[in-house]
Amino acid sequence: GVQTCALPIFFALTLLALIVKGPKFKGKLKYRWNIPLVLAGFVLFAGVTQLALEKRVLSNYFGNIAFAYEDYGYPYCLGVTIFDTGISCPRDYSEKEIKRIEKTEENLPETREGEYPNIIFLQLESFFDPELVNYLEISEDPIPNFRKLMKEYTSGYYKVPSVGAGTANTEFESITGMSLRYFGPGEYPYKSILKETTCESAPYVLGELGYSSHAIHNNEANFYGRRSIFPNLGFDTFTSAEYMPEEDDKNPLGWTRDRVLTDEILKCLDSTEDQPDYVYTISVQGHGAYPEEPELEEHEITVTGSPTASKNNQWEYYVNQIHEMDNFVKELTDRLEDYPEDVVLVMYGDHLPTMGLTVEDVDNKYLFQTQYVIWDNMGLE
C-alpha cells in the first residue's frame, strides 16, 4: 500500500540527500579495499541475521511491535519492517488462473436453505483466566460465570496473533479468517491495506445468506481507524461509544464499562425483522495500563504473590476489572436466553494483559492464546 511504499522511498531519499549534501572525504579512497569490505559487511550481516532467525534468536514475526524493538533493537526492527512487507503476489496470479480455480470448486455442496441463527461475536479486552498465572494467589474465582459456561458449552483455547496489545489484529483475524503471518512484521492491516480496499470477510460471506452485519465498540470510533475500516469489511452499521446513552459509565482508568454493551447488542438484534444478524462486539473495560499504586476503593477480590508491590497492585486492579466483565457475560447470556430468536454467541479474549508474562509464568506454557466459549439459546449439542 501507499504507507508501506512510503517508508523505503523516504529512506532512499534521505540517503541520497546525505550523499549529495553531506561532508566529503578529502583523502584518497582505496576502492580496491573499501568496496570488498563493504560487500563483505553486507554478506556477513545477512548471514548472521539468517542464522539468528534459524536459531530463533531473532524473529520476523512481532506479536507486539513495542516489545520487539526492546528485544531486538532499533536497526533490525526498522530494517525488517521496511523491507519485509508480507507475502508476495504469486507468480501465476491472474484472472485466468482464478477462473480455473473457481471451476475446481463447482462440485462443492450448496449451502442449505433455511432459517439461520443470529451470530454474535464478543471480543473481550485482555480477558483470560488469571488462575493460569502460577505465582498468583487470588482470594476467589474472578470469572465464575465464564468458567461455568466453559464447562457446559463448547470451549477451549483461542490462538491470537498478539500479546499485551494489538486488539485490532485479533479482530482482523477473527473477522476475515486471514493470518497476520501473511503480512509484514508488526503490520496492522487496519492501518495499511484496509484503508484503501476491501477484503473477504464474515460480513460479506454472511451477507450472501441474507445476514445484516453490525459492529459495536464501547470506545471512540476513530480508535484503530475503525470508523473507516468497518465499511470496508462489509459491516452495515457501526455503533461506537459516542452513540451510547451510558457512555459515561467509566471504570477508574476512564474506559467505558462493558455492561453498557448488553442493550446495544439487543438493539442490533431488534433492528431487523425476518433477517438474521451478525453482531461483532469489541469490549474495552479490561484495557491497561494498569495502576501501580493501590486504589482508594477497597477491591472485592484481593491478589497476592506478585514479585513486587506495584505489580501486585496492577494484578489486583486487572482481576477486579475482569470480574466485572464476567458479571457482564452473565447479564448478557441471561438476557439472550429469553430472546425470541435463535442466537449463537462466541466469546473470547483478544490477548493476554500487558503484565510482562513469560511462558514460565503460565500453566498452559503459551502466551499467544486466550480462552473461548460458544454459547447458544437453542439447545445445540
Task: Report the location of each language-model feature.
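N-terminal secretory/membrane-targeting segments
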Residues: 1-2, 6-117, 138-157, 192-196, ...
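Solvent-exposed soluble domains appended to multi-pass membrane proteins
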Residues: 106-115, 123-124, 129-381
